[in-house]
């Protein structure tokens, strides 16, 4: 058991060092790059990577870290690998910054489209027209962008009394019928950029949604945690 614990701790230490190295390399390559066009967009996506890079997303930097010391690649190409890996996932690295950078704009437009109220058809049509003009808006890119982006909507802002150990009660409008309410139990370390296995549990006539959550996740302890 001690050997297994040591192995896990060593893995965490290695991941931490890789994350720190990725951040340092991003700063270094940003200083070396000579790109002036869309510089603000380049800075925005690099800032996002540095802010949200963690153990759950470090695998997206695999191509970038592997080729970061390749003297044959320019700083622009290395940043393209970092950006495309961040947006599309590990193994999807693109060395052309002119192809990788528009993916950031495409991703942001997709997020805006999903956030826009369904009754605002005009704005949604405008977003679709913008997407049609951008490189990287094809189905093969959109599928990967959506799979690796954060949820379009923020979780509901609840008081500490209403939010017990990651438990949320949400509802879905059902037209003329009353809203459909349901419960979601998130794990303590929940990260929206990590993929988790999901259990969809339907209660029967003799139980309640809360009882189903208790059965799968356990009951609360004194610290209001499961």
Labelled PLM ranges:
Residues 4-196:
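A domain-start/cap signature at the N-terminus of enzymes
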Residues 198, 202-226:
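Active-site machinery of serine-nucleophile hydrolases
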